[in-house]
Design a protein with these regions (language model features):
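Ligand-binding loop in jelly-roll beta-barrel domains
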Residues: 101-106, 288-291
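A short glycine-rich beta-alpha junction/loop motif
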Residues: 90-95, 129-155, 277-281, 313-333
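Short alpha-helix capping/helix-loop boundary micro-motifs
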Residues: 47-56
Length: 372
């Protein structure tokens, strides 16, 4: 039986791979490196310049379809990462373990298998000591070649890898779509609230007000003991950066804009409805009868309240300072129309984000079942 037609089998990497150690000091191939999350990237993307220096002459000249294993530990890949080069060629650090797969196997599939999180179990056993001073794991080329792979026939490898490639392309498209929607929404918010939108500018006159004149409530939330906040509970607890947890009592009931008052993301805004608990690190904002709360969500975001935070060890917003800020607003009916228009973007974005979560979940499930 031809090896390409064999059913699933277990084989050491060294039996299907061979070392690549070619160098070419005269090569003009791009200088690249391995990123745990993105694969091969230009070295200048991370270091602002190519920092190979005198060691460049020792860099490995990798060709398209060959692989490199970066045995450097990172947060994303604790035991290093392995990727196939898809560019025609590249010069890469000589500390990488470089190799090529023989023609009886489908290289993209092998690359996926080697970069799968389940491979960490084997790599962990190979680490002979702690991380070296240069940040590299003590995994030699010979050690790496000893890891075992569970391989189907060549044709099945190709079918699987090609399907996952299409899925990755679909995920990348979804990410670009979400980025475009968010960018378009930001542009729409700026265009409308700066008074440049003829559709809404002509609809009513815009008048200047302070934030205090627009709101029936604009105050910090209430103090709550950390012992009362749990992973589960009846009501969400909002702090300066979003939901902190849940508790069994509420401080606010209704529709409010929550502004983060303290923390790294102070000035962030979100709309909440129903019963919630707002801690002292959040500001509860509710429009008065002449204005619309949903409109304030976009207005406060447009005003970038974070720029008014007091600088210090813990950035924070002073409510009395924010209440004096001035802004231009239309009448309530126009506010409602603007809020409805902008919320349609939020609905589209959240719908597409749910689709992205589903696609990523399906990918993880497939990889979990494929590689053992």
């Amino acid at each position: 039986m031809c090896i390409r037609d064999r059913p699933y089998r277990t084989t050491p990497l060294g039996e299907i791979a061979s070392l690549v150690n070619r160098t070419d000091p005269k090569s003009n191939a791009p200088i690249m490196m391995l990123s745990a999350g993105n694969g091969f990237i230009m070295q200048s993307e991370k270091y602002s310049r190519d920092n190979a220096g005198q060691s460049l002459k020792k860099y490995i000249l990798l060709k398209q379809g060959e692989l490199a294993y970066n045995h450097g530990a990172s947060k994303a890949k604790q035991f290093g990462c392995c990727y196939e080069l898809t560019e025609p060629e590249a010069r890469i650090p000589y500390v990488y373990h470089c190799f090529k797969i023989n023609e009886d196997e489908y290289t993209p599939y092998v690359a996926m298998a080697l970069n799968n999180s389940k491979m960490d179990q084997q790599l962990k056993r190979l680490v002979s000591s702690s991380v070296r001073m240069d940040g590299l794991l003590n995994i030699s080329f010979e050690d790496y070649m000893s890891v075992t792979l569970y391989l189907p026939s060549f044709i099945e490898q190709k079918h699987i890898a090609d399907f996952l490639k299409k899925l990755d392309e679909r995920i990348a498209y979804q990410e670009r779509l979400i980025t475009s929607l968010k960018k378009y929404k930001r542009g729409a918010v700026t265009h409308i609230l700066s008074g440049k939108s003829m559709a809404f500018a002509v609809a009513s006159s815009w008048t200047e007000h302070t934030l205090s004149e627009l709101c029936s409530e604009f105050r910090s939330g209430r103090n709550i003991s950390a012992t009362l906040i749990h992973q589960n509970g009846n009501y969400p607890v909002y702090g300066g950066n979003g939901i902190r947890g849940y508790c069994n009592q509420y401080s606010h009931d209704g529709e409010y804009v929550v502004v983060g008052r303290q923390g790294a993301l102070c000035g962030n805004v979100r709309l909440i409805q129903g019963k919630n608990y707002l801690s002292e690190h959040a500001i509860a904002v509710q429009a008065n009868g002449a204005n619309e709360t949903k409109f304030l969500l976009y207005l406060l975001d447009y005003m970038k309240l974070g720029q008014y935070s007091d600088q210090g060890a813990q950035p924070g917003l002073a409510v009395n300072k924010l209440l004096r800020l001035k802004c231009m607003v239309p009448d309530k009916q126009t506010q409602i129309k603007i809020a409805s228009f902008l919320m349609s973007f939020d609905f589209q974005i959240s719908t597409q984000e749910r689709m992205l979560m589903l696609l990523n979940s399906q990918r993880r499930a497939l990889l979990q079942q494929l590689f053992i």
